[in-house]
Structure formats: structure tokens, C-alpha cells
């Protein structure tokens, strides 16, 4: 008898297919998992009614895939191309959970770049107004108050930056979320960085990562993201590096590459725009709102206050007509600060939320 973690079932099944003259007895659970996690034969999960006419066929497949993995408490990486609607696929899963969980409902946590936090709020309010959502913001005491009352909400959204600052509050709270979603999962590419260390300390029943870039581009990044969605699945980084990364990157070992692909394939779903081109609608324009970072806001407000007074004095002295050039110059400066303060201030090295969103 061989006992393996349940999440290695499909990998084992692929290996067994290559073994000849070997008799294997497979129990009911084994056969069920193999069948259900076949991406061509996903379990039929009921899509929430309001999404039936919104989700495109490939997005419905994404919903089924997320739900099937969650049924076994597996994690996964949704790696569709940018613009293919990863957010709405996740929202449909969150709504499905709320509809089907009658008792002991848990809160879910979405962690994103600060520039996308408001986008999550807007998308949820647009497509799933029944979800009670809260974006964590404010000073340290205000954020702590929200975290200590997370049970009041269906979904909490925070940024990677705030999660790093608040991690001790989460640990003290000791709450197990229903889902934790890591948006723009390339933020976890460095396993030793604070972003990755913080989010990996948060407890959840199921973990999913979203990224629009091919994760196979960097094997170290691949390992770090898997270490978040299913800790231990790709072993320790030391073992992963010696078994796969070194063999593939330095030695071009095709056998190691094939084995790694077999390992990760059930838990990564990636569709490109080219693959689903016939399902895509005509081009639409979406206005994304962006909130300035703390340092950027301080600079903007400081310049605004000083400039308003100067312009008022200028108008009082020379009249509106003669002051128009200075008014235009001031507006240009404010616009530059909104775009990126480095356009206005030399050696400005703080993050810029608008640039991050782009």
C-alpha cells in the first residue's frame, strides 16, 4: 500500500499510464478525483443565476475549475491572459459559496496591488451587490478595527503593502478565511520578500492565485506561487531547485520538464486571447478609478493648497485674463503629480499607484 497526499493523485495517474505490465487497484476516491479534475470533464457546478448570461463559455469553464478544486480543498493558479476576466470568474465562485453555505459562513480575503483594490470593490458591487465587501484602509487603528470585525463581511480586500504592515494583527486574530485570493500573483515571485512571507502566514480553507503572465517563465516564481496555493506540493525550494530548476534551466533536461508539467498541469488554468478569440466581444472601454498612494496624496494636497493661494493673489493683482498661463501651468503640475510625482520632483523614489495599475 502506498499512501500519498490527495493532491498528487493526478500526477500518480499520469505515471501509472506509462507503466506497463503493472496491476494497480484504484479505490473509488482515486477514480473520482481523476475524473473530476480532468479539465475536459469538470464537475457540473451550478453557476449563480446572475452570471448565466454574463460569463462566456471559457469563463464558465474557469468557474467549474475553481469550484472543483475547492471541493477537494486544493489550490490553483488562474493564469488567463490579461483582459479575459479572471476577476469575474472569482466573484462568481464567491457568490456560489454564499448561496450554498447556509450556516457558519466565513469571510474571504482578496489581496491585490493597492492600485487594484478599488477595482475589486467596484466589480463586486457591480456584479454581486449581495456580497458585503470592505476595503481595508485608513490609519493603523482604523485598519485594526476592521480586521477585528472581519466576520461582519463576505469579502475583505487589502493590498500587499497593508498586509505586510498588518500581519501581526491577522496572526493575533487567528482567523481562517474561506478563500484567500492573491491577485497579480507575480508579487509573490520572491519567496524571501515580505509580500510572500506575509500572505503565506494567513490561514484559509482554499487558496487561489491570479496572474496574467505565463508562470513557467521563472521556475523560482512558479515554486513560490505554488508554495502559497498549496504549501509543500512542490516540495521545499531546496529540493525543487535540485530536482527541477537546475535540471531544466542549466541542463535542458526534457524529462524533468515533462515531470514538472505533469505535476502542475491540473492546478494551473491558462487561456490566451488567441485561444478564445471567437468568444470575445467587440472592444469595450472601461474606466478604472485609481486612488493615490499616501505619499503621492500628501504632495498633491500640499501643492494644491500653496498654488490656490498664489493663483488667487495673481488674479487679484493682474486679473483673470492675464493669469491664464499661470493657471494652466498649475493645472499641468497637478496633472504631473497625478501621473507620477517624479515628473515634478527630482529623485522621487516612492511607489506610484497609477504606474502600478498600468
Question: What residue spans do the PLM features occupy?
Answer:
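Accessory nucleic-acid engagement/destabilization modules that flank
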Residues: 1-32
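ASCE P-loop NTPase motor core, strongest for the SF2 helicase catalytic module
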Residues: 25-252, 261-358
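Long, charge-dense, solvent-exposed interaction surfaces that engage phosphate-rich ligands
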Residues: 257-259
Amino acid at each position: 500500500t502506498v499512501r500519498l497526499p490527495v493532491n498528487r493523485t493526478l500526477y500518480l495517474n499520469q505515471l501509472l499510464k506509462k507503466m506497463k505490465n503493472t496491476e494497480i487497484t484504484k479505490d473509488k476516491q482515486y477514480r473520482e478525483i481523476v475524473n473530476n479534475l480532468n479539465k475536459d470533464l469538470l464537475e457540473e457546478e451550478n453557476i449563480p443565476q446572475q452570471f448565466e448570461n454574463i460569463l462566456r463559455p471559457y469563463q464558465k469553464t474557469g468557474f467549474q475549475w475553481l469550484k472543483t478544486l475547492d471541493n477537494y480543498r486544493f489550490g490553483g493558479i488562474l493564469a488567463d491572459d490579461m483582459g479575459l476576466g479572471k476577476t469575474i470568474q472569482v466573484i462568481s465562485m464567491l457568490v456560489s459559496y454564499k448561496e450554498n453555505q447556509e450556516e457558519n459562513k466565513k469571510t474571504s480575503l482578496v489581496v491585490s496591488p493597492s492600485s487594484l483594490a478599488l477595482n475589486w470593490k467596484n466589480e463586486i458591487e457591480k456584479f454581486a451587490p449581495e456580497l458585503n465587501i470592505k476595503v481595508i484602509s485608513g490609519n493603523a487603528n482604523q485598519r485594526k478595527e476592521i480586521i477585528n470585525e472581519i466576520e461582519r463581511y463576505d469579502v475583505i480586500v487589502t493590498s500587499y503593502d497593508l498586509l505586510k504592515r498588518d500581519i501581526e494583527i491577522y496572526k493575533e486574530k487567528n482567523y481562517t478565511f474561506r478563500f484567500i485570493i492573491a491577485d497579480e500573483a507575480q508579487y509573490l515571485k520572491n519567496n524571501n520578500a515580505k509580500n510572500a512571507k506575509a500572505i503565506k502566514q494567513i490561514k484559509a480553507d482554499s487558496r487561489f492565485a491570479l496572474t496574467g503572465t505565463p508562470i513557467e517563465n521563472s521556475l523560482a516564481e512558479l515554486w513560490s506561487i505554488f508554495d502559497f496555493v498549496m504549501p509543500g506540493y512542490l516540495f521545499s525550494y531546496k529540493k525543487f531547485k535540485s530536482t527541477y530548476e537546475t535540471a531544466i534551466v542549466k541542463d535542458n533536461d526534457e524529462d524533468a520538464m515533462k515531470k514538472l508539467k505533469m505535476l502542475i498541469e491540473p492546478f494551473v488554468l491558462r487561456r490566451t486571447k488567441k485561444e478564445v478569440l471567437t468568444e470575445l466581444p467587440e472592444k469595450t472601454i472601461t474606466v478604472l478609478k485609481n486612488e493615490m498612494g499616501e505619499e503621492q496624496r500628501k504632495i498633491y494636497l500640499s501643492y494644491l493648497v500653496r498654488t490656490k493661494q498664489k493663483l488667487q493673489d495673481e488674479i487679484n493683482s493682474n486679473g483673470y485674463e492675464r493669469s491664464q498661463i499661470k493657471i494652466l501651468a498649475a493645472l499641468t503640475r497637478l496633472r504631473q503629480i497625478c501621473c507620477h510625482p517624479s515628473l515634478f520632483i527630482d529623485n522621487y523614489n516612492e511607489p506610484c499607484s497609477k504606474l502600478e495599475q498600468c
